[in-house]
């Protein structure tokens, strides 16, 4: 999972809920990674740790076109940083897939030849179906994860400017709620 924000952590919880044994979340914010770790996820600060080595320690090894890599089948981009797609293409195992959740303005380059040789799949994700909402409710009712722990701040509607500023501070905030 690329991105330890609200969407990344929620997607990681979904992966665990639907049966993934191991889920690793990577981000550049130690604050957010600590929140993810407290929820039981393996973490990697890929701004200073070797992501491939960390992932191999969690998932084991698998073949790729470029040698041994992490035995991870699913990658999710919940961060939207420009190099993520290229990073996936360089380290994704054969027949792995990348789901893009984070929206980034403009076009993103894809090496279609590499995608073909590695048998990678690139999947877009947008919107919800009624059954998705039912799944989210089931996860919340289950109370297996302390989902409320990702709420770091609450503001009144009159404090919306401060709330937006706080939400942009990834080293001190994760999920900022505005009460109205």
Per-range role (PLM):
Residues 1-49:
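Mid-domain Rossmann-like dinucleotide-binding core that forms the NAD(H)/NADP(H) cofactor-binding site
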Residues 18, 70, 74, 145, ...:
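Structured loop/turn residues at beta-strand edges in well-structured enzyme cores
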Residues 24, 97-99, 123, 177:
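Structural detector of well-ordered beta-strand residues that form the stable sheet scaffold
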Residues 28-29, 104, 128:
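Residues in the short beta-alpha loop(s) of Rossmann-like NAD(P)-binding domains
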Residues 34, 39-121:
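Glycine-rich cofactor phosphate-binding loops and adjacent beta1-alpha1 units
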Residues 86-90, 130-180:
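C-terminal hydrophobic helical "lid"/dimerization subdomain
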